[in-house]
Amino acid sequence: MNALTAVQNNAVDSDQDYSGFTLIPSAQSPRLLELTFTEQTTKQFLEQVAEWPVQALEYKSFLRFRVGKILDDLCANQLQPLLLKTLLNRAEGALLINAVGVDDVKQADEMVKLATAVAHLIGRSNFDAMSGQYYARFVVKNVDNSDSYLRQPHRVMELHNDGTYVEEITDYVLMMKIDEQNMQGGNSLLLHLDDWEHLDHYFRHPMARRPMRFAAPPSKNVSKDVFHPVFDVDQQGRPVMRYIDQFVQPKDFEEGVWLSELSDAIEISKGILSVPVPVGKFLLINNLFWLHGRDRFTPHPDLRRELMRQRGYFAYATHHYQTHQ
């Protein structure tokens, strides 16, 4: 098995015409595609979902799929297959999504509706214990006293996968920028597993398949530890990861040293992408073969960034991990 997968240069068909949105490769990598909903599509979508406040989407989970169908219908039913094809394609698996005209914090509810529609065209977003909803909104400020690196602005949040400390499978992660004030820096950091120079070394190490304990801090509202290996394989035998440096709890010297070396090898990778995400845009990535993090911010007394996340599972046939369910 070859752990590395070449990028397909023709992954995006430049001659393809889509209804309601455009699709182009990003400036950072052909693996990351930029999808932009047209002004007309955005306007029509927001008009058609205006009758449902965000609270309705929280209380009635089937409405999340309803708004997804509305968006897909406005795109001539080309959106859903395109999203699934991209996210399941090992050579891509990541989208930066934008809706023309949705770019102000005053439109925060509209942003949640749009992101919810997109997410529920590919699967379903899991319950987020930190917020008590299917999504979480949180703020990064200049001073932080929380119990994880999620809100700490003046340091790099290291690359990781989401869903490492919960039992639910986390196939996708959606990260949306709702507001930003007095900000410099803080780009999203992404690393595709197949662009990581040290993948083969760590994937083939005996420690790679050893179940390890993952435990979350109190702010996550998750009290039960979970056990799983850092690496697994998909149905085609390709490496996937469930890893975060903050929450893995090595049981002994051997595990601790290996995890420390693994973390260093990830952070020095030349394959890391630095991606600016303006207000109103969101990243949607395959969580099994993309790692994500955040660069540091320049200090400012009035620094503020508000983010929204959703993470969940793909709703299609058989998938997930091959060996460790």
UniProtKB/Swiss-Prot annotation:
Associated pathway: Amino-acid degradation
Gene3D superfamilies reported for this sequence: Clavaminate synthase-like
Enzyme class: oxidoreductase
Keyword Signal: no
Needed co-factor(s): Fe(2+)
UniProt-listed InterPro entries: GlaH, TauD-like_sf
Pfam families listed in its UniProt record: CsiD
Annotated EC: 1.14.11.64
Binding site for Fe cation: 160, 162, 292
Gene Ontology biological process terms in this record: L-lysine catabolic process
Annotated function: Acts as an alpha-ketoglutarate-dependent dioxygenase catalyzing hydroxylation of glutarate (GA) to L-2-hydroxyglutarate (L2HG). Functions in a L-lysine degradation pathway that proceeds via cadaverine, glutarate and L-2-hydroxyglutarate.
Oligomeric form and interacting partners: Homotetramer.
Listed HAMAP family: glutarate_hydroxylase
The protein's name: Glutarate 2-hydroxylase
UniProt organism field: Escherichia coli O157:H7
Designated gene of the protein: glaH
